[in-house]
């Protein structure tokens, strides 16, 4: 019997990106560079191509581990969508992107802390609670503008809306986020209904940083500050029925995941 090696081939592609990334950061972060360099050097496959064992480094900046997290999060989020729809017939899913102004690397850590506090104020508002939402999934993403060299942290959120529930319009969400963030200069939030399709699930299955944002080398002197800013930051936060779905389905926190496949269930 021949092995299905498609997963191994995809890991190999990401491994090349990881080696390039490790070379770049070696002068400023040799320990992290070493972990990423040796990540995924030993991978065990089942006959049907599932990754049964591997020495993944699990670092947030490792291209291989980023890819594995995204693959697993996509499947888990799809299963959560299906579980929630079965438990709450007629519910809707609303996708919201909450942005803040770009900041230089020196201000990123404080901006992330401010965003966490703003989110707490946002969800504690009396008018927000009156919406009667069933739960949500909030994901943090941080991108880098290659032209300005600034960083753009933002939240992707999927809200689960009960059947027949009225939701306010775009201007209400923008105003509430401005007040929660205590920043009147915020001029944009993105609000739309999603259906659990592949494209909508992919949007909330990203991980905190993308290796494509680090194709050049201008960011290298900033890496230690970036790494420190994202340390101990909660990037994946389910609540309500979404947390219940993950618990019922036996999913673990993405940062604690081994990044191998669950060979007992075939995925």
Task: Report each predicted region and the residues it spans.
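Right-hand nucleic-acid polymerase module
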Residues: 1-151, 161-267
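Cys/His-coordinated zinc-finger cores
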Residues: 157
């Amino acid at each position: 019997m021949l092995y299905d090696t498609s997963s191994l081939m995809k890991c190999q592609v990401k491994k090349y990106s990881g080696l390039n990334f490790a070379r770049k950061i070696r002068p400023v972060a040799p320990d992290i560079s070493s972990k990423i360099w040796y990540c995924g050097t030993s991978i065990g496959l089942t006959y049907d191509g599932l990754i049964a064992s591997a020495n993944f480094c699990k670092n947030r900046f490792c291209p291989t581990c980023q890819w594995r997290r995204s693959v697993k999060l996509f499947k888990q989020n799809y299963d959560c969508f299906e579980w929630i729809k079965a438990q709450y017939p007629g519910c809707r899913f609303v996708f919201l992107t909450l942005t803040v102004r770009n900041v230089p690397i020196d201000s990123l850590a404080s901006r992330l802390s401010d965003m966490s506090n703003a989110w707490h104020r946002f969800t504690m508002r009396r008018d927000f609670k009156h919406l009667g939402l069933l739960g949500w999934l909030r994901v943090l993403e941080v991108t880098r503008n290659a032209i300005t060299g600034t960083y753009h942290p933002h939240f992707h959120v999927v809200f689960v809306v009960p059947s027949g529930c009225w939701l306010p319009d775009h201007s209400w969400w923008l105003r509430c986020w401005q007040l929660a963030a205590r920043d009147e200069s915020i001029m944009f939030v993105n609000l739309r209904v999603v259906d659990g399709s592949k494209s909508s699930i992919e949007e909330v299955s990203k991980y905190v940083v993308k290796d494509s944002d680090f194709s050049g080398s201008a960011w290298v002197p900033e890496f230690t500050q970036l790494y420190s800013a994202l340390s101990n930051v909660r990037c994946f936060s389910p609540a309500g029925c979404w947390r219940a779905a993950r618990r019922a389905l036996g999913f673990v926190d993405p940062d604690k995941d081994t990044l191998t496949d669950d060979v007992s269930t075939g995925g």
